[in-house]
């Protein structure tokens, strides 16, 4: 049985407490749970508690406390409700990891937007394609924020929030998620420069390509090695030298980012994916 000491009552349905047994900062959600509750009051396990968000790490607790101190109660409540939207939509989301990151991001994004300061999301297209489920959840979150906070979060913010969600559910750090997006973005720029045409980011070829890059990065980070038939590899290099040279450039760029060795087989498979773009472009040109 948990005993909680109330730190802050946001409204009748949301309170921030300390779990006396485990010494964790927690957010409690429940209908009427905050009614007539004051700071310092004790609260035992109750049927009124519908949801508990735990902050286990000391640094997360300190960070969250600092955010709570500077946040408007209405904004904080709306962020907690956004967390509820996310965890109801996807049960694989690790809420203890996401709570602080989401609060921090939305709180400062809200302040920026109120001051008409906007940040461009350079990886919006990649995020939408790679993490489509997280992106759709983020759309619901932004709609909720816009409605309750009477503000207009831009589409770029949907992408940022989707990254936080994807990072939590896929057990990846936000740095890893952003690195993957950056590598994909640079790969597309290399292809567009050398192929001399714009890549259709709505095409099946694009979706397959970014998935290939995503799993290629994971293989490289894990040190996994794939094999390819030498005859097949030599044939691709001979028939599609431009695609092969583009693949070499992309692999060199990836090596700089990941500091790993990349074997010939990966070059061959990447060449194959790049060739799919050229074939589709030829079809579109001849229509």
UniProtKB/Swiss-Prot annotation:
SMART domains the UniProt entry points to: CAT_RBD
Residue numbers of Phosphohistidine PTMs: 105
Domain PRD: 67-175, 176-284
The keyword Phosphoprotein is annotated on this UniProt entry: yes
Repeat keyword on record: yes
Keyword tags: Activator, Phosphoprotein, Repeat, RNA-binding, Transcription, Transcription regulation
Biological process terms in GO annotation: positive regulation of DNA-templated transcription
Gene Ontology molecular function terms on file: RNA binding
Function: Mediates positive regulation of the ptsG/glcA and glcB genes by functioning as an antiterminator factor of transcription via its interaction with the RNA-antiterminator (RAT) sequence located upstream of the ptsG/glcA gene.
Subunit: Homodimer.
Family the UniProt entry places it in: Belongs to the transcriptional antiterminator BglG family. GlcT subfamily.
Name of protein: GlcA/glcB genes antiterminator
Name of the encoding gene: glcT
């Amino acid at each position: 049985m948990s005993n909680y000491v109330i730190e802050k009552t946001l409204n009748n349905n949301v309170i921030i407490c300390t779990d006396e047994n485990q010494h964790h900062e927690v957010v409690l959600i429940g209908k009427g749970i905050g009614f007539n509750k004051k700071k310092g009051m004790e609260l035992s396990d109750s049927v009124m508690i519908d949801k508990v968000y735990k902050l286990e790490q000391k640094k997360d607790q300190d960070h969250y406390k600092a955010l709570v101190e500077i946040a408007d109660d209405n904004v904080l409540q709306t962020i907690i409700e956004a967390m509820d939207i996310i965890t109801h939509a996807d049960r694989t989301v690790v809420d203890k990891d996401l709570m602080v990151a989401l609060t921090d991001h939305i709180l400062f994004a809200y302040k920026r937007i109120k001051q008409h300061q906007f940040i461009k999301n350079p990886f919006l297209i990649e995020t939408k394609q790679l993490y489509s489920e997280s992106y759709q959840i983020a759309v619901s979150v932004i709609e909720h924020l816009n409605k309750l906070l009477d503000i207009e979060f831009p589409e770029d913010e949907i992408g940022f929030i989707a990254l936080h969600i994807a990072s939590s559910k896929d057990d990846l750090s936000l740095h890893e998620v952003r690195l993957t997006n950056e590598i994909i973005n640079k790969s597309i720029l290399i292809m567009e420069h050398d192929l001399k045409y714009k890549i259709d980011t709505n095409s099946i070829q694009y979706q397959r390509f970014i998935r290939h890059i995503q799993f290629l990065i994971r293989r490289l980070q894990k040190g996994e090695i794939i094999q390819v038939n030498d005859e097949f590899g030599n044939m691709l290099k001979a028939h599609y030298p431009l695609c092969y040279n583009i693949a070499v450039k992309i692999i060199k760029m990836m090596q700089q980012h990941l500091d790993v060795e990349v074997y010939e087989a990966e070059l061959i498979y990447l060449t194959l994916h790049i060739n799919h773009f050229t074939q589709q472009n030829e079809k579109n040109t001849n229509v």
